[in-house]
Amino acid sequence: MGMGDYLSKLLSDKYGIQTMHHEGVYDLVDGKLDRSKAYQLAEPEIQKILEDNPSIEVVIDLHRDGVAEGTHLVTEVNGKPTAQIMFFNGLSRTKANGNIDYLKNPYIEDNLAFSLQMQISAANKYPGFTRRIYLRGYRYNMHLKPKTLLIEAGAQTNTVEEMRNAMEVLADTLDNVLTK
């Protein structure tokens, strides 16, 4: 079971949060890994899912971070080794040029606020679980819905156990933010 499946199962079974897990692959072009257009390729399908399911309140784009082989993004939560996570936000702007007009995003503030709520909730209950909120110029399809989270969960250097433990903490944190 992949981590998206596991997170979806935790949210629905343990917390009663109805989920839909989309497993589209958008970074393989003609059988070769190419991430340069992944968000552009995903956008129409994600838009359709949101249009067909207007009750969706939260969108989570779950990734593993790519780090140097010697880097291990792990902390201990409740005595268990747990992969750390990082919230990633697209601002549709650059420091040098300001707003990127062709990358409109009406939900920048909503998504930043949601990331910050998640970060604070996790820091209060699970110190060390989150890394930082990472800000970049692109929008990463975060313009499609308020309460969109792009999450870098662990990295390729984390074990399955560490990742599963992280999904448990992430699910609990999401439940805390959404219901409290």
Task: State the predicted function of each range.
Residues 19-21, 58-61, 86-88, 132, ...:
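Structural recognition of the beta-strand scaffold that forms the well-ordered cores
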Residues 107-134:
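Active-site-adjacent substrate-binding region
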Residues 68-104:
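A short, glycine/acidic-enriched catalytic loop
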Residues 1-2, 33-40, 105-113, 157-165:
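Soluble non-cytosolic domains of exported or imported proteins
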Residues 25-29, 64-69, 91-95, 138-141, ...:
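Solvent-exposed loop/turn segments at secondary-structure junctions
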Residues 1-57, 65-75, 168, 178-179:
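N-terminal catalytic or cofactor-binding beta/alpha core of small enzyme domains
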Residues 15-18, 54-58, 82-84, 128-129, ...:
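Loop/turn elements at helix/coil->beta-strand transitions in domains of secreted/extracellular proteins
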Residues 129-180:
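Active-site-adjacent mobile loop/cap segments within catalytic or ligand-binding domains
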